[in-house]
Amino acid sequence: ILYRLVGSEMCIRDRIIRTGKNINLTILASGSEVNLAIETSHKLAKQKIYSKVISMPCQEIFDKQNKSYKDKILKESKNTFSIEAGSKMSWEKYIEKGLSFSIEDFGKSAPYKKVYDHFGLSSEKISKKIKFYLKKWQ
């Protein structure tokens, strides 16, 4: 049975997917990029860099939340990063200190993992850039 969803019913509220003690950073993602965020979080944890991963499938719902809720999600750590297999434009408003990993150029045709890797969207490349950022700006 398929149900017809209307308007905001299609948007699901954000979820904390991975967290722990001594959080150094927050990683925001949605859809298929959440798995990439989790892989990145695991790679960073092996280097004693701990992160919180947030699945945010509907920014419109998040934006309507009260300040204390948004602060709980975004302000627990000093640094916030986002992963998006499209434009970073919608994520930039959440990042005061940190980076957006995204694909700003188009026209590459290949299996998605090769395209992601070409644009730097692999857990290996993202974790290295995050580690470099933290060393440089902390």
For the regions a protein language model found, what residue spans apply to each?
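Single conserved hydrophobic/aromatic residue that forms the stacking wall/gate
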Residues: 1-7, 11-12
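Active-site proximal loops enriched in glycine and acidic residues that flank catalytic Cys/His/Asp
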Residues: 29-32, 38, 53-60, 83-87, ...
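Short, solvent-exposed amphipathic alpha-helical segments in soluble enzyme
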Residues: 8-9, 39-47, 70-71, 95-100
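Structural motif
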Residues: 24-26, 51-52, 78-82, 98-101
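Long hydrophobic segments that form regular secondary structure
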Residues: 13-54
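Peripheral docking tails and interdomain loops at the edges
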Residues: 82-138
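Short beta-alpha connecting loops at secondary-structure transitions
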Residues: 23-25, 64-69, 107-118
